[in-house]
Swiss-Prot record:
Gene source species: Synechocystis sp. (strain ATCC 27184 / PCC 6803 / Kazusa)
Entries under InterPro entries matching the protein: Anion-transp_ATPase-like_dom (IPR025723), ArsA_HSP20-like (IPR040612), ATPase_ArsA/GET3 (IPR016300), HSP20-like_chaperone (IPR008978), P-loop_NTPase (IPR027417)
EC number: 7.3.2.7
Any one Gene Ontology molecular-function term assigned to this protein's record: ATP hydrolysis activity
Protein name per its UniProtKB record: Putative arsenical pump-driving ATPase
Amino acid sequence: MRVILMTGKGGVGKTSVAAATGLRCAELGHKTLVLSTDPAHSLADSFDLELGHEPRLVKENLWGAELDALMELEGNWGAVKRYITQVLQARGLDGVQAEELAILPGMDEIFGLVRMKRHYDEADYDVLIIDSAPTGTALRLLSLPEVGGWYMRRFYKPLQGMSVALRPLVEPLFRPIAGFSLPDKEVMDAPYEFYEQIEALEKVLTDNTQTSVRLVTNPEKMVLKESLRAHAYLSLYNVSTDLVIANRILPETIDDPFFQRWKSNQQVYKQEIYDNFHPLPVKEAPLFSEEMCGLAALERLKDTLYKDEDPSQVYYKENTINIVQGSNNDYSLELYLPGIPKEQIQLNKTGDELNVRIGNHRRNLVLPQALAALSPAGAKMEDDYLKIRFAEAVKR
């Protein structure tokens, strides 16, 4: 199954682009599902029909759905949420506060992606288009298998079994003192199942032969900067971007003096889009004279963007991690981090793991054996790649 995630700053038009992309894929005979994971859904408005949690046929070969995040959250995390709520209420918090604190930031977004993984496993469609890709919080949760895998396997799994076995013996003594029960098997199983879901999801998202991100942006300073940051963070987590779409460009036919400054600024930032995202391909879409609402309007956007192309193709295979062997038994680990100054990157090697931190984003890379036995011997930024040299430690 081909998976395409549309992302971009709010208001850039990613829902319209997602819907138009779905139209073209369906037109070519691909069974296509456009799934909105944005809490503020607008996919139904874009198609101009009612959509719900389950896929609905829009036209031949095309289905649409708007994810109910609360329903997904309850199905995947309900037992843990109820238990944490019980514990917090026993400590004096009221019901609403306790329920809010029982949900980790980003979990609603991550379970939206878990829903995507379920469609992927069921293989009911040829193309799956996600409207609104993960936020930074949800992306950080994708690093859970690397950061927490060792602890989950060695500590949580044994603790899980021991807790379930001892609960009948300890519960009569524990509850009168604590004011709440010990977690039961359903509660203890949920975190590990969550970890396994994220681990499986990560494998899908980082497979650049099937999954890629489409960045939708506008030729404006703030929007462009946000898009560049998103591209860098996606690269940090090894999620490939294959296409950039510059949307809402003022047509040349507009000659009203009021828009001349806007047009001039757009030309500057449009060129920056091409320069900053090179070598990624860039497509342009104009600001239309009407809202992209309804199939007729989306057909115009579809024809402008793709003409006779198949949008399910992978436009560019972005290699975000490379390992290059040197001539002196040394290696270079190359991480694609576009637009990130070297000064903002922090590195730390512990055992066979390399910790890479950029601001609030962190990734733990498990090093292959050849690199794990060596020590970092320098780093430099070159052509948007952070190149970290590994060599044998100098003996003193």
